[in-house]
Structures are given as structure tokens and as C-alpha cells.
A protein has these predicted regions:
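Bacterial Sec-dependent N-terminal signal peptides
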Residues: 1-26
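Sec-dependent signal peptide cleavage junction
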Residues: 18-55
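Alpha-helical scaffolding within the catalytic cores
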Residues: 45-56, 255-264, 301
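A short, charged/proline- and glycine-enriched loop
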Residues: 61-65
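Short hydrophobic beta-strand that contains or immediately precedes a catalytic carboxylate
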Residues: 68-71
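Conserved SGNH/GDSL esterase-like catalytic core that processes O-acyl groups on lipids
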Residues: 74-187, 193-298
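Single conserved hydrophobic/aromatic residue that forms the stacking wall/gate
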Residues: 302-312
Length: 312
């Protein structure tokens, strides 16, 4: 059951103030009047169903709950969003969920999460849905890296200073390989299963890890085009997975450019979708509220369940 919540200029959560585990300190500002924070629920039945899953996870465990939030630079930076993720990881004793969706922005020379880090060699070219002259296609994560060299060696590793017990045992690569002549090789002997599809490759490991090394290599002289749209780090353990998707400068139309959005969102099957976009729309001199609301409505329609899904 999917729940859809639009948040235009901010989203503050006090529900999880129960926990004392904070990855960052934060300031209290007098000019923020939290009495005006309000959640408007349009479908109380769905909302109650979502809260019921949260309740069961809190008390008993065993639930698979996926929350995905879309935003701009505040989400790409991953400081605030990782705080939410850290809360979800530590607020209940049963939560073993992994990182979730991730784009390695270092590959395209942009700022990346300080919590799941990457190093790499090999040259890549970057594209973002927020840059008008960056051509498509784009996927769920709003960015794309195209491999220029014939090989690239990438390591992904958890920053243990800020993320305790952050492990994964499955990695999904969201890709497009125009000539099907590139190989993704996970450099470990603990692979138990590999699933290869046209635009997705999944690797299941025999044990939980907090780092992995990957070799992407072209296998023929024909160049073709290898595009990486992002990854999903998941775990067989149950719990709340908080996926954060952010691109510097992203506006509402930016995500409407992502033609692989719906194909790739099935990978996480979200229970709750949060749109935290709008600031980059509103400050433009050409801003029109009618266009803004129309674009937002289109986003909501794209991500709303079909009538058939409503009956499930």
C-alpha cells in the first residue's frame, strides 16, 4: 500500500524525538514557529495502514517498509536526510534495513554523501536532471554517469564514524548498456546469486558487508555507451529503509524529465513517497503558481497507484 505525501518547503519530524542517538547536533531557531507545522491527511485509511506497519515494526519487527524522499541540494548533501535514516536505524531494536538508493556523485565530480563514500579510477561524464542542457535519459535518482574509459574500478564503503551497524548483502545496479558489451564484476568470493537484466544487475552476497569493490569493464573494442543511473544497497534483514534522492538545483520539472522513473521505482516498492521539492521553482523570476501546482499534480499522478493497486 503506497502513501503519498507532498511537502513543499520543508518537513520537520518530531515524532522520533524519543531517541537520543543523534549523528549531528542542531540549533533551535526562534523564527521557526513549529506550532504551524501541520500534516494534512487526504486518505486516512491508507495513512492508518502505513502507521500500522510502523507500529508492528516498532514492537515486533518483521516488516519491510520503504520510504523514499525526493529533493534538491539539501537531499544530495545527505546530512539532514541521513539523520532521518540514522533515527530509523536506531529507534527500534529490530531494524536491520540497509542504505537503500544511492547515486555515486563523486563519479561525476559533484558533492556526495559523507556517510556512504566512494573512490574510483576511470573517467566518467555526468548529467543531472536539473541542468537544462544535460540531455536525457534520466532514471529514478535524477542523475546519470556515462563511462568514458574502457574500465573503472569503484569502491563503496560505509563511513563508520557516522554509521554503526550499517551493512548490506545485496547490490542492484541501475544501468543501460547500449551494446551489452560491459561487465560488472563484484570483487568478492561471497557472491551467491547474480541476476542479469537489460537495465538492472543484482548481486546477492552470502554475508553482510560494509564495503565492496566493483570493476566495470568493456569487453570488446566497440565502444557503445554504458550509463549508470544509481545503485540500491539492501539487506535480507527486515526494517525501515529510508531512501533519499536529491540532485543539486532540482525543481519539480526536473523529476518530470526522468523517463525511467516509474520503471525503476518498482525496485523499492515504496510505502511512503515524500516530495520535498519546490524551493528551486519558487525563487525564479518567471515563477507561476499555476504552472507550479500543475507540475506537482503531474508528479503525484505519476507516482499514485493504479486503480487495480488500490484494491490490493
Amino acid at each position: 500500500m503506497k502513501i503519498f505525501l507532498s511537502i513543499y518547503f520543508g518537513f520537520l519530524i518530531s515524532y522520533f524525538s524519543y531517541t537520543q542517538h543523534y549523528p549531528h547536533d542542531h540549533m533551535q531557531y526562534d523564527f521557526i514557529d513549529q506550532k504551524h507545522n501541520e500534516l494534512v491527511i487526504f486518505n486516512k485509511k491508507k495513512w492508518s495502514s502505513f502507521l500500522s506497519k510502523i507500529h508492528n515494526q516498532w514492537h515486533y519487527g518483521g516488516e519491510e517498509i520503504n520510504i523514499i524522499q525526493f529533493g534538491g541540494s539539501h537531499i544530495q548533501a545527505d546530512v539532514w536526510s541521513n539523520r532521518l535514516r540514522d533515527h530509523f536505524q536506531h529507534i527500534v531494536p529490530y531494524n536491520g534495513a540497509a542504505r537503500g538508493l544511492y547515486f555515486p556523485f563523486k563519479l561525476i565530480k559533484s558533492n556526495a554523501s559523507p556517510y556512504l563514500k566512494t573512490t574510483h579510477n576511470g573517467e566518467w561524464k555526468g548529467f543531472r536532471n536539473s541542468v537544462s542542457y544535460h540531455h536525457s535519459p534520466f532514471g529514478l535518482l535524477g542523475a546519470r554517469a556515462e563511462l568514458i574509459d574502457s574500465t573503472s574500478f569503484i569502491t563503496f564503503y560505509v563511513n563508520k564514524e557516522h554509521c554503526v551497524n550499517c551493512y548490506f548483502d545485496q547490490i542492484d545496479f541501475l544501468i543501460h548498456d547500449s551494446l551489452n558489451n560491459h561487465c560488472i564484476d563484484i570483487l568478492t568470493d561471497s557472491i551467491v546469486s547474480i541476476e542479469l537484466d537489460t537495465d538492472r544487475q543484482s548481486f546477492i552476497l552470502s554475508n553482510l558487508v560494509d564495503s565492496v569493490a566493483v570493476l566495470i569493464e568493456r569487453e570488446s573494442h566497440e565502444k557503445g555507451k554504458f550509463s549508470l543511473f544509481g545503485l540500491n544497497f539492501s539487506s535480507q534483514l527486515k526494517g525501515i529503509t529510508y531512501h533519499s534522492v536529491g540532485v543539486n538545483g532540482a525543481s519539480v520539472p526536473s523529476y518530470l524529465r526522468c523517463e525511467y522513473f516509474m520503471d525503476q521505482i518498482d525496485l523499492v516498492n515504496p510505502d511512503l513517497i515524500i516530495f520535498s521539492i519546490g524551493i528551486n521553482d519558487a525563487y525564479e523570476p518567471s515563477f507561476l503558481s499555476e504552472t507550479y501546482f500543475k507540475n506537482y499534480d503531474t508528479c503525484l499522478l505519476y507516482t499514485s497507484p493504479s486503480p487495480r493497486d488500490e484494491t490490493k
